[in-house]
Structures are given as structure tokens and as C-alpha cells.
Amino acid sequence: MTTGKTAPRRLSIFGSTGSIGRNTLNVVEHLGGRDNFEISVLTGNGNVELLARQAKASGARLAVTASDRHYDSLKSALSGSGIAVASGKSGLMEAADCEADWVMAAIVGTAGLAPTLAAARRGADIALANKECLVSAGDLFLKSIREGGGRLLPVDSEHNAIFQVLEENQRHAVERVVLTASGGPFRTASLKEMADVTVETARAHPNWSMGLKISIDSASMFNKALEMIEARHLFGLTPDQIEVILHPQSIIHSMVGYTDGSVLAQLGAPDMRTAIGYALSFPRRPNLPIERLDFARLARLDFEAPDEVRFPALRLARLAMTRGGVQGAVLNGAKEVALEAFIAGRLSFLAMADITERVMDDLAHLPPAAEMDDVFSADSQARQRASQLMKLDLVG
């Protein structure tokens, strides 16, 4: 006689030690933990101690550090646990091959591309938090999803909001999508004030708790620029259908406008667990301990148009979408080098966009990507050119 109890759902979390990964494990625990879920793989990078703790607590089958030099430390930390250990690029590909019904793709940067594409081709549902999959390799990634037969579930709060309110049978009637942005710590800063921005002031996001790089990307609005490109691929939009509005309270996460004048919006407290929980439970809605909105206390919601002189990243996103091809990969690669230079104190805050635009112009001749090697080549060329420009002191 059967009990009727369903088998635990198999999950893999790529990037479990980051903010998205930690919140994913938190959601899993709130939704029943090991009673309802089986963790196949956890991957991290240098935070071996946290990765080992997570693997033991969740009962993961495999723990992977993306850095080969941390393999011995992870192996030692998990000695006697029965949890397999792997490292480096080969370890990440091993993680992608492990059986899992649902994969959280939260590895930051191009390092997340290959394992996420491999998991997609295998047919897993992909909860996508890695931006490079769509920004750098959108067409190829979507092809992998189609060929594998799994679902693509956006985890970025803005895209998840659109996903929640986009009526599948009314896609033909979509007129526009509106991505909201808090404006970050420099929403009201002057151009002169932004010229003197430091890493510490740039990382202080008013609403969201995030890692260093994504906090600075949010401050420069490069994060929103990447989200614009992602939205185009995710929802089959033209560049003209994508708008950005500043909304400092971060309560409305995005809106969809229809041809009859209706606008549907998703509202909620700024908590990543909402989007993660929806992606994990889709098409059902989970019961999560998220702060409920008190509209009487909230009282008001503010909006304003973004200033693309102070935040040129938005203009660069439209330029990349208009040019097409590998310009998304070029934008992202150049931006990454400029961001690292800013963090290291070698480049000013405003010069990040200048460097990125110069590289985009210099590499505008590159052909569209026919395979992933073309994407990696465009990314590599963009990074090399950005480094060259900074060495020549052409900007900043």
C-alpha cells in the first residue's frame, strides 16, 4: 500500500554561499527542508567554511568550490561526512550533470555560463539569477532551454514581478514593461558629487542587502542596464517596449502595460525570498515569513524618470540591444573590468561608463555568436580592450 507521499524534489544551488544562494537555502528550510527537498549539489567559491556548513546542514550529495586552490580545504572540512567534493571548471560541469529537477543559477559572472547552459540542456528547470546567461548569450541560452525542455524561471525581483503579472494568453497585447529602480544611494546626487564617489558610499544600497559588486552595479545603474537586456530576451520584447522608472521605496517591483491602457504591477516588501519562493514553487504560491505590506503606514509611492546623463548605463543598454549580436557580452565584459578597477581605486565611478562605451564602439564590428566560444571570445576581447584603455589613461 502506498502512502501517497511524493518524493522529495531534487535541487541544485549554483552559488550557494552568495546572497541569492543563502536566501534559497532559507526558503527551502521554510518550505519543509529535507522532508520536501533533496539537495543534489551546492557550489561556492572561496568561502569554504560556509559551503561546508551548508552542505552538512542540507545533506548535499556534492559540494563544489569553483577554485581549485580551495579543493583541499573543502575536502578536509567535509571529511567523514560522506559528501563528495569537486573543484574548478570540471567540478562545476560535474555539478551541472548531477540529477536535479530544479537548479538555482546564482554564480556571479561568466563562470556561471557553462554549468547553467549544461543544466538547461539536460532539461532541468532553471531559476535564473545569473545575468550573463541572457545578457551575454541570450539567444544561445534560450535555445538550450528549448532543446532541454525545462522551464526558465526568472529570479531577479524585477523579472520575477513581470513573470508573475504577465498573462500568458495575452502576450500579444503587451505594450510595454516598466522596470523599477530604487535609484540607489545616488538618486539625488549631482554629477559633481558623483565624480567623487567612493567604494564605501557606492556599496550602501538604501533598500536591498546585496554583495559588493552588485551593490556598486546598482549604484551606477549598470545592474538595471543588464536587466533591460535580460527582459528583452526573457519576454520577447523590442528595446522600445522596455522602460525604467525610479521608485525609491522598492515596493513596486515591475509593471506590465497592455494595449487597453491597463497596467498590472507586482508589489511586495524588498525581500529576495519572495522571488525565490515563487520560482521554487511555481505555479503555486508558497507560504513564507515575508513582511506584509501595510498600505496605511506606507502612505505614498514615489516615481521619477531616470537621468541618463548621471546614469549613462541605461543608454548603453539600449545601444547594445539596438546593435544586437555580441554587444551584450561586450558591455558586460568591459563593465566588469571597469568595476574591478573602481573597487581597486584605479578608476573613478563615472569613468566606468566611459570605458564601457569606448569598448562597445571599438568592438561593434564583431559578428553575432554562432556558438558559446564566440560569446567567450567577445567577453575576452572586451576585457582586454578595457584594460588597454585604462592603461593608456584615455579615461578617468
From Swiss-Prot:
Native organism taxonomy: Bacteria, Pseudomonadati, Pseudomonadota, Alphaproteobacteria, Hyphomicrobiales
Residues noted as binding NADPH in the record, renumbered to the chain: T17, G18, S19, I20, N47, N130, E132, G211
- Name by which UniProt lists this protein: 1-deoxy-D-xylulose 5-phosphate reductoisomerase
Q: Its Enzyme Commission number?
A: 1.1.1.267
Q: Which keywords does the record carry? A: Isoprene biosynthesis, Manganese, Metal-binding, NADP, Oxidoreductase
GO BP terms: namely:
isopentenyl diphosphate biosynthetic process, methylerythritol 4-phosphate pathway involved in terpenoid biosynthetic process
GO MF terms here are: 1-deoxy-D-xylulose-5-phosphate reductoisomerase activity; manganese ion binding; NADPH binding
Q: Which cofactor does it need?
A: Mg(2+); Mn(2+)
Q: What does this protein do?
A: Catalyzes the NADPH-dependent rearrangement and reduction of 1-deoxy-D-xylulose-5-phosphate (DXP) to 2-C-methyl-D-erythritol 4-phosphate (MEP).
